[in-house]
Amino acid sequence: MRYWGKLLGLVLGVMYAPGVVGALLGLLVGHMVDRALGAKRRGFFADQQTRQSLFFRTTFQVMGHLTKAKGRVTEVDIQLASQLMDRMQLHGAARTAAQQAFREGKESHFPLRKTLQEFRRVCFGRFDLIRIFLEIQLQAAFADGSLHPNERQVLYVIAEELGISRGQFDQFLRMFDGGRQFGGHGGWQGQQGGYSQSGYQRAPQGPTLEDACKVLGVNSSDDSVAIKRAYRKLMGEHHPDKLVAKGLPPEMMEMAKQKAQEIQAAYDLIKREKGFK
């Protein structure tokens, strides 16, 4: 059914410019429309295995690129990446593939924007997958306990290519920062700390009401209805089985579970502090 654009273009072309020239111009415009719609359809109907494979490869490619942004990949960086692979229980061929993708991302000529554009196309209409992808990259950026200015700039590029505005990204960053206090996905070595506009800061031990509100993306002054709505939305977006069905690699299912546990812990803390069920 990829001829409707050409047919419509032909009709409109003849209507506005009678003759061969109008017909040719209409067909040309219609052909371009058909190609654009076809690309969107391919993204929307990409099979699950294709999305999972691309998600897996792109995750480690971009992670390698992000790590290299600081200037030089150190042994600590490699160890942190290996810890993530351990959390995913990657062994054998899967681990080798992840390591190869990580090395590809470190190359100076790695096409970051093009890679992200292809990833976004295949994830068409699945923002929850894009959200998980960005959360994993934030883990990589904060793995050593701080956010390098160059890493921040790369993260802005990642967000931009994935259709996330600067304001949305800053909200992601605040939510991620709150999650670090719950001992979840925010740090591979259990660092405690926070990030503000001025940089990395030491945070008090143990999560606070403010931390929990950051995780859910709400304010401490919000009522129970707004908080419950935010909680349910986040839990729905991070449901491991649903994410795998949409294209999350099975290897990353454990990370989705940990994020869901973090959201639950934050919600429980808010309920205790604010006194509602």
UniProtKB/Swiss-Prot annotation:
Naming one, the record's GO cellular component terms include: plasma membrane
Q: Which CDD domains match?
A: DnaJ, terB_like_DjlA
Q: Spell out which residues lie on the membrane's Periplasmic side.
A: 1-6
All residue ranges annotated as the J domain in the record: 211-277
One GO molecular function term? Answer: protein-folding chaperone binding
* Residue spans, topological domain Cytoplasmic: 32-277
Gene3D superfamilies from the UniProt entry: DnaJ domain, TerB-like
- The organism's superkingdom is given as Bacteria
Keywords on record: Cell inner membrane, Cell membrane, Chaperone, Membrane, Transmembrane, Transmembrane helix
Q: Where in the cell is it found?
A: Cell inner membrane
Any stretches that span the bilayer, and where are they?
A: 7-31
Q: Which InterPro entries match?
A: DjlA (IPR023749), DjlA_DnaK_co-chaperone (IPR050817), DjlA_N (IPR007791), DnaJ_domain (IPR001623), J_dom_sf (IPR036869), TerB-like (IPR029024)
> Topology relative to the membrane, per the entry?
Single-pass type III membrane protein
Q: How does it assemble?
A: Homodimer.
Role according to the record: Regulatory DnaK co-chaperone. Direct interaction between DnaK and DjlA is needed for the induction of the wcaABCDE operon, involved in the synthesis of a colanic acid polysaccharide capsule, possibly through activation of the RcsB/RcsC phosphotransfer signaling pathway. The colanic acid capsule may help the bacterium survive conditions outside the host.
- NCBIfam families linked: PRK09430.1
Domain observations:
The transmembrane domain is a dimerization domain.
Instruction: Please state what the protein is called.
Output: Co-chaperone protein DjlA
Lineage from the top down?
Answer: Bacteria, Pseudomonadati, Pseudomonadota, Gammaproteobacteria, Enterobacterales
